[in-house]
């Protein structure tokens, strides 16, 4: 991830930062780096995302695997901007994308996905790309602003998607 994202050469600019997060899931290791910009009003733009995972010994369909990586990142970023509302005694209020939308195309950054093949048994690769994007982005926001995001959605911490 360090090489692909240019981590060692990242510039120290006000309002710009990179963050990393990693985790172990489905018998594989996954890491993501996010590069973000934050303006004076707290509007966050994710400029680029790099995602990588150790998914075992074989990938049957590389194009589908890459698409699943994209989907996990986009879905995870979407969850950062809103929360699920529960109505007492009725369950979840949101019923579909009209009242719980995913990111719009203009908000989706360039995403690079890399899979590392190892001698381990094949593992899942779609779902494990979702969780690390949340701390990768919030760590990047901290690098850009000095302010930690400890509560989601972003609006609860004074930020929102640009």
Model-derived regions, located:
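Short beta-strand scaffold segments in enzyme catalytic cores
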Residues: 32-36
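C-terminal catalytic domains of large/alpha subunits in multi-subunit enzymes
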Residues: 1-27, 37-162
């Amino acid at each position: 991830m360090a090489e692909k994202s240019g981590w060692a050469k990242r510039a120290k600019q006000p309002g710009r930062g990179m963050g990393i997060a990693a985790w172990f899931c489905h018998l594989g290791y996954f890491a993501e780096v996010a590069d973000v910009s934050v303006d004076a009003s707290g509007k966050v733009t994710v400029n680029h995302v790099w995602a990588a995972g150790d998914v075992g010994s074989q990938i049957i369909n590389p194009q589908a695997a890459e698409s699943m990586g994209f989907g996990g990142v986009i879905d995870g970023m979407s969850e950062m901007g809103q929360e699920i509302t529960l109505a007492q005694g009725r369950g979840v209020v949101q019923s579909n994308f009209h009242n719980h939308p995913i990111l719009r195309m203009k908000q989706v950054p360039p995403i690079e996905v890399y899979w590392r093949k190892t001698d381990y048994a094949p593992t899942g690769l779609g779902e494990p790309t979702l969780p690390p994007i949340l701390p990768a982005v919030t760590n990047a926001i901290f690098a850009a602003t000095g302010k930690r995001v400890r509560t989601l959605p972003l609006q609860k911490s004074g930020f929102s998607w640009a």
